[in-house]
Amino acid sequence: MSLEFELASPAHTGQILEMQEKFYAIDHYPFDAAKANLIMQHFLTSPDLGKIWLLRLKDELIGYLALTFCYSFEFGGRIGFLDEFFIEKIFRQQGFGSQTLSYVLIEAKKLELKVLHLETERHNLAGKALYHKFGFKDHDRHLLTKFL
């Protein structure tokens, strides 16, 4: 079965937030609905920040993928970060992750992105295998974070 990909708009905020809360719950990340709503509204009304695609199977919403933009001198220009990629549990391991990554790689080339980055939890072996299958590689670097 083939997925359809719909570019998200502010009208989709509620649907995305429902899935985002499930996504965050997988690894026990805190989820503040009011804060998430403000962040999502800002993102979806600022196309220079990135894009979110809704994953649809027939008429059913089964997931989403958020691609954010940034700039890198090392990599030669605008790059993308696959910030969030969620598929509802009952639809996993059915090829929809592969379909989504295939689609996003095409879109990234259309957007003239130089590189795509992503991060995954160490325990997410299925996700890591999928990303490796699509050519994502571990860099011999550490992603460090400082909250401001």
Where are these regions (language model features)?
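Active-site acidic-Proline motif in GNAT/NAT acetyltransferases
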Residues: 88-90, 94, 122-123
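Extreme N-terminal starter segment of soluble prokaryotic enzymes
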Residues: 2-4
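Conserved GNAT acetyl-CoA-binding A-motif
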Residues: 101, 109-119
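Acetyl-CoA-dependent GNAT
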Residues: 7-14, 18-77, 83, 101, ...
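Hydrophobic adenine-recognition pocket in adenosine-nucleotide-binding enzymes
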Residues: 8, 85-87, 120
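Conserved acetyl-CoA pyrophosphate-binding loop and the N-cap/start of the following alpha-helix
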Residues: 91, 95-103
